[in-house]
A protein has these predicted regions:
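Extracytoplasmic/periplasmic ligand-capture domains
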Residues: 1-111, 117, 127-175
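Flexible hinge/switch segments at interdomain interfaces of large molecular machines
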Residues: 120-123
């Protein structure tokens, strides 16, 4: 390393899995830095004179990946709970309907308390590889129902979603 002298003589990395414990350690002065601040605590931390918040856009995205390749997916059932004879997720209209049924604005405002941006692809604006052609799907439950009916599912179907829990901020709530 041939750059300027670092500002620290040593750094100790202390993994603290529990979000409340991380926050308590910061407020008690036991640690100097934490990441993954719970959204419910951001407003409070903004009023803490000894705390400086830093926010930025990241490439952390929670997305829905559906089982569109198997003929008989294990976690997809008919509207009345029977095994499917044809995978509805293979139909692009069904996948588009699922996307249209997600209220991204509500997720940002209610679940993430305003500290997120709606995602329409894996990379946010400003990241290499992002496509300006892919737009965030508008929330349109009526349009989603229409597409499901066109695809042959006027009564819908059942799908079990699996997702992380306590790996990312509010991940289980988002799912």
């Amino acid at each position: 390393y041939h750059g300027p002298k670092p500002h620290w003589a040593k750094i100790i990395i202390k993994p603290i899995k529990s979000a409340p414990s991380r926050l308590a350690a910061l407020l008690a002065g036991d640690v100097d830095f934490i990441d993954q601040v719970p959204t419910v605590d951001i407003a409070r931390l903004k009023n803490e004179p000894k705390v400086q918040l830093s926010q930025g856009v990241s490439n952390r995205v929670i997305y829905l990946h559906v089982d569109q390749f198997r003929d008989n997916p294990q976690y997809v059932k008919t509207h009345d709970g029977k095994p499917v004879t044809k995978n509805p997720l293979k139909d692009v209209r069904v996948r588009k309907a699922l996307s249209m049924a997600i209220n991204r604005k509500a997720i940002v405002e209610r679940v993430m308390e305003g500290v997120a941006i709606p995602a329409g692809q894996l990379l946010p604006e400003g990241f290499f590889g992002r496509s300006d052609k892919l737009k965030v799907e508008k929330y349109d439950p009526d349009g989603a129902k229409k597409l499901l009916a066109e695809a042959g599912y006027p009564n819908g179907f059942q799908v079990t979603l699996h997702g992380p829990n306590n790996r990312y901020i509010n991940d289980a709530k988002i799912v």
